[in-house]
Swiss-Prot record:
Belongs to the FKBP-type PPIase family. Tig subfamily. It catalyses: [protein]-peptidylproline (omega=180) = [protein]-peptidylproline (omega=0). HAMAP family: Trigger_factor_Tig (MF_00303). Residues 165-251 form the PPIase FKBP-type domain. Its main location: cytoplasm. InterPro entries: PPIase_dom_sf (IPR046357), PPIase_FKBP_dom (IPR001179), Trig_fac (IPR005215), Trigger_fac_C (IPR008880), Trigger_fac_C_sf (IPR037041), Trigger_fac_ribosome-bd_bac (IPR008881), Trigger_fac_ribosome-bd_sf (IPR036611), Trigger_fact/SurA_dom_sf (IPR027304). Consists of 3 domains; the N-terminus binds the ribosome, the middle domain has PPIase activity, while the C-terminus has intrinsic chaperone activity on its own. This is Trigger factor. Coiled coil: none annotated. It is found in: Cytoplasm. GO terms for cellular component: cytoplasm. Its EC number is 5.2.1.8. Keywords: Cell cycle, Cell division, Chaperone, Cytoplasm, Isomerase, Rotamase. The gene is tig.
Amino acid sequence: MEINAQKLNEANATVEAKIAKQDVEKKEEKIAKELAKTMNIPGFRKGKVPPAVIKKRYGDKLAQDAEAELVREALDQALEELGIEKEAMLGEPRFAKYEKGEEVIEMVLEIGVRPNIDITGYEEVIPEYEEPQVSDEEVEKRIEELADAMAQFKEIEEDRPAKEGDLVVIDFKGTLEDGSEIEGGSAQNFELRLGSGQFIPGFEEQVEGMKKGETKTIEVTFPEDYPNKELAGKKANFEVTLHTIKEKEKINIDDELAKKMLQKEDATLDELKEEVRKQLKSEKLSKLYNEELKPKLVEALVEKFEFDLPKNIVDQEIDVQLNNKAAQMSEEEIKELRENKEKLEELRKEIEPEAQKSVKATFIVDALAKAEGINVADQEVVQTIYYEALQMGRNPQEILKAYEEQGLLPAIKMAMIEDRLLTHLLSKKNEKQEENA
């Protein structure tokens, strides 16, 4: 077997090999002898099956196994010659060529290798930033919102008209201009928060001003973009009877509120304000990190470090991004791409720079995470998936199984590592800024 291994750069290598027919036959003979020791074939004692019988019965399979084993041997020899550890090889080697002739098999394997990245000086590109401040007005507004959310609706005793913000209990029945009833357009003892925008424009505004026990016909027009096309743009009448008006009880902003919110018997309003200030600051900082600083940091890291990228990993990322684009295409566009290889190749070329950037960022994040001791346990990945599934009202086990089947768990884990790493780097920068201030 002739082997010619070559490193194209730090992240890519090729293996050219010629496997002679005799090599394949020898390997078939060896495999047949090993199988003969263990196989049970009627008419022969166990371990006494002649290799010729094995070859006759399993000829095609033996040939495939022999070729596969010789390919592995060629790969192992090439890796040893090039000084590449098996653990450093990324993904499966790809056949750029595999031609079977009568006397020889000619093949070319492409190998992707994990690049060595010198991350010296990464601290220099972590962006500086001013820590967000929280005003007293923002704190007061948030406490008022929290108090409003805690407040209960109570039926009013005074005889006054309904107004925006009230919770009213109504019966309604809707009909079109021709007198036909609107399907799903009727209800009894329906609770409606006036000003919520829950009903079509004009409905809630006309309920405002009604009193308890009053019945009124409300005229409205369904919007042109109303989801139900049969109703879009049509005029309708709703006969509405108002039964009850409720308003939110007023909650005093004081120590008693603080005790309820902080679940502490000795809590004070000042403590509550301090906790709310911290929460608001955390929210602002999170928004600053996610919307501005993290993208800026990734961009800076990608620009700072230069290294070779394994072609097979870049191609995989191109496939991912291509599939994402295809998900937004029409059937006609997808069909055209399938039938027009030149156009498909053009699209891949168009995607390639962004794919390279994504792969490069992943390698940098991986190297920095190791340097900074940042990791995410598999159990944390599962917990995150469970939490997000519950938030969406989905079955966590089904979501987890789907992600496993689609091979998405490593990508989710890497995204979590990236998020944790970038937050860690920015926090360290912030601490140094405070020390130097």
